[in-house]
Amino acid sequence: MMADKMSINVTSKINSITLVLAMALSAFANGQVRDSTLHFVDSIQLQIKDSSQLPKPKLKTLKGVVFDKTINEPVAFATIYFPKSTVGTVADEQGYFELNFEKVPNDTLRIQAIGYKTFNYIWSKKSIDSFALFVIEQSNTMLKEVVVKAGESPSILFMKEVFKHKNGNDISTNSNYAYELYNKLEADVTGLTKEQFEKIPFTKPFSFIYNNLDSTSEKESFLPVYLIEALSDYYCSNNPKGQREIIKASLQRGIENESIAQFLGSMYQNINCYNNFIDVFNKKFISPLSSAGLLFYKYRITDTQYVKGVPVIQVQFKPKRKGENCFFGSCWIVDSNYSLQRIQLNIPEEANVNFIDKISIYQEYKPLDSTRWFLNKDKLSAHFILPYGSKLPGFIGRKTSSYKNIHVNEAFILDSINRVAQQKELSIVAGAKDKDKSYWLENRHDSLSQNEKNIYKFIDTVQTLPVFNLYKRVIQVVTLGTYDTKYFQFGPYWSMYSRNRIEGTRLRFSMGTTKNLFKDLYLFGYAAYGTLDQKWKYKGSALYLLNRAPRSYVYASYKHDLDRQTGNYEDATSDYLFGNVIRKSGVPIKLAFSDEYRLEFFKEHFNGFSFHTQIVHKDFTPYSPLPSNFIFEQNNNNGMSLSNTEFGIKLRYAYKEKFLEGDYLRASLGSKYPIIELKIAGAIGGFLKSSYTYQKAQLSVSDNVNIAPFGNLYYKVFTGKVLGVVPYPLLEVHPGNDFHYYNRNDFNMMYRYEFVSDRYAGFIFEHTLGNGVFNYIPVIKKFKFRQFWNLKALYGNLSKENYNLNNPSSSSNNYTFRTLANIPYIELGTGIENILQVFRLDFVWRLSPTNIVESIPRNFGVFGSVKFEF
């Protein structure tokens, strides 16, 4: 009566990468729990082996494990049964189950779990006595609301207790703690089918990639392309404040960059669900355990379970209102002390986050002692997509963390922090990247899957292919504008051609060195030629890194070129392919020619303090309409040019500022604390060809303040003074904007060289609201626009002596420098950002002064810009 016993081996393993891929291809439930019928044989390939020689069992057995599709974690206490039968069971806390029956009741196996969609698997009656992995998908739907007429909802009462006890349960509030941290970061290309791949030109050399495509079905595939691991010791003290992390081992394939290893550290990637706000890709989301959680979330108690003999309460949560930065998901709370046992966070479809289709966070805690639970496992996965590129291949990033050797309130922790008090908080030990295979086998917290093991060999093989390097260069040219050979870098291409009224057509060739030529020395230079003035311009510079951490360097340069007076990287410039296209019409271009010699020394300390000294000699010759006669002829000048040698120092304090390191240069990622800068400079008349004696100083404080859930505030306040009687190039020439490209640090409705001062003060203020009012307009909110407003103000004045020098009555030049002595400069702006996820549109009003002397006076302007932000 019974069929021969069949043994079933799973050949298509559902590993962690496969489960992350499934996240990218799943859809949200639109408010309803949906049944999904999948053909089991399509999802898990089974290889059946004949075992007729074995004794026939009395009962047939189906064994398996139920996994969460998004986070690759077992689903505890799921219900597995055959509909319209009495055959069923409940999985244990590890998702494992066994079903025993004499015959297969029907061909449908149903799996249900609270917080998940119901899944029906078409089960082959021949596939029995087997072990299989079942993958189910989370539902963005809570149980139906139960109306409690008398008193508060039990869910609300329970969560109030959780909020009340969270400070005691949060280990990070203890005096000190320490642990060993293992981090793993993986990147995969997803949605790349064989058919799509074959359509890409010149892919024949990559044919072996087909063997590295993992899939759960013929339609779902992804290609692992990058893997990095890091092992570190982390120490933290709250009283006194201090922290220290030592990355003792790192292993990576793909991008060779030390700062990537740093960003895997605990200080860069630490998510604490007990906090009121959780930072996800620089966006503040309200935690479901926030003290104000009842204002933003709906909670429902859905189940009681036992984990390691301890009763835990499952609570589902979701946002009260769509469009707010909140999560949906579930948390499991220990019944005895209201601490977290595990939590699953998902970002809803309506969340205003760019370039990301889905984000999932999973944390699991384990008992530290009889009363305290500490974080044991932490997973973050995100599916990145191009704007409006749902049909294009995407990208999955997945970070997995685990914690061992946990210590709380022990004396050695503070000693470890104090022992290295003069060093930086995050460091990488020498030889961290040189650990061998045996070290990782012994110290890795969890073994790599077979797929992850293949990544190291796979990436090494790909990078040796000439076609791969060609693709890399093409992508670099398109995105960065530069082209690299082994020893030299050429570009950027957008500076190769431009036009202006002085030079006519300007052609420029730029070249720099790469780390393959000099490890710590960067040489850069360019040559340019103007067809109208028929003059060559050029620049040569050298940067030598004395130390990378803490950073110190010397820099020297010589430039023989037009002086465009650009003050920061956001300034638009005419030395640009599209510079004339975005210039304001009717505004004369104001240029000067300069010969500039520069020598700099920079030294940074681990505590965030740095000093930057420089000596700059410049010969400055302005072009009309900027004046020179009767201004520069003071102190034996020839009246047409200004010669000056300035000594300067900049003191800067940026506590816990983060950087993204390049081969030689670096980009600041900002700080959570205010950044303070003090600049002091001066010159001595007659010394090193200086024509004037003066001193000047400027002080500024800037900060980005997150005021979630009300958005983000940026402010900058500044003041300065110039002592001495000097011509306008040595005064404070307030930064105006002659382009329709918006600049956050300039006064966009002010013209360049419109106002000068020898004493001044001002501020810049911008409030980004997020969705703002757009969240309440039914059709508009689907576009996920973001709202902001800003205010800029400046007061400045000139001494009588400086005013008379720079506006001489005997001058034949009609150009007049203005001051802000009688009325401050004020501009007010608002606008829309996140247009098509990358563009920003500013509407700016100049409130005062309104008496504009340019040929086309404007009190209102429209500006565009590009802004890449999650």
At which residue positions do the language-model features occur?
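Coil residues (strongly favoring Ser/Thr
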Residues: 35-36, 42-43, 51, 108, ...
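Conserved "repeat-terminator" motif of extracellular CCP/Sushi domains
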Residues: 53-57, 132-142, 146-151
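Short, ordered, surface-exposed loop/turn motifs in non-cytosolic proteins
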Residues: 58-63, 69-84
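Short Pro-Gly-centered beta-turn/loop motif in secreted/extracellular proteins
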Residues: 72-75, 98-106
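A short, solvent-exposed loop/turn motif at the edges and junctions
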Residues: 82-84, 108-121
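Short, acidic Ser/Thr/Gly-rich low-complexity loop/linker segments typical of extracellular
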Residues: 85-96
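Structured extracytoplasmic
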Residues: 140, 149-312, 318-326, 389-491, ...
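Exposed, low-structure sequence patches enriched in small/polar residues
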Residues: 285, 418-870
